Amino acid sequence: FQKMNILVPLDQQMGDFNDVAGQLLPSAMSTAMVKGSYYALALNTNTKILFYNADALAAAGIEVPKTMDEMFAAIHTLSGTNENGQQVWGLNEPALAGWNVLPYIWSNGGNITDDACTTATGYVNSPETVAAVQKLVDLYADGEFTGFNSGDIPMTDGFGTGRYAMMLEGPWKTAELSGAYPDVAYGT
């Protein structure tokens, strides 16, 4: 639409644009700029954080992971079965389609494209990117990482009942947990 010149720059149409934009994160607002003009307001961002079951980590003698390697080691240690013989997964990720896989790739030093988003070859197939994706495949194959199948335990319920020891999710999950599982001891 921008190439067709049918979009109207918000910063030229809104008298209070600078006041409104000044209340938003500059990094998020940078995604709304095209050729020196703003065409949108970045009203929300999506930050993923690690939620961990504090009791599960304590029982396993594990410190809160601070690196990806520590997180992968914790996933392995926390996976298995509970006292009722039910499977426990070290990590739940709601989906790895699209952008959800990117934090794993970026944390491993990989990327999908060059900075200009014009070239994928050499990035999406870089050793760092491939290794990050392979690690997720291995965790799934070993039963340490939840699947993406119909009938999987919903994220909040799995975490709240101890079937998922850790999860990567946004800060909105705290409201869900406090409402549905107020007695679960967890950290972020």
Q: In which residue ranges do the predicted regions lie?
A:
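Hinge/lid segment of periplasmic solute-binding proteins
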Residues: 1-48, 63, 72, 104
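Short helices/loops that flank or line small-molecule/ion binding pockets
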Residues: 4, 56-57, 73-77, 153-167
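Stable alpha-helical elements in mature extracytoplasmic
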Residues: 6, 10-13, 53, 67-74, ...
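Extracytoplasmic/periplasmic solute-binding protein
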Residues: 30-43, 48, 70-121, 134, ...
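Glycine-centered hinge/linker elements that transmit conformational signals in sensory
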Residues: 75-77, 118-148
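Extracytoplasmic/periplasmic substrate-binding proteins
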Residues: 103, 134-188
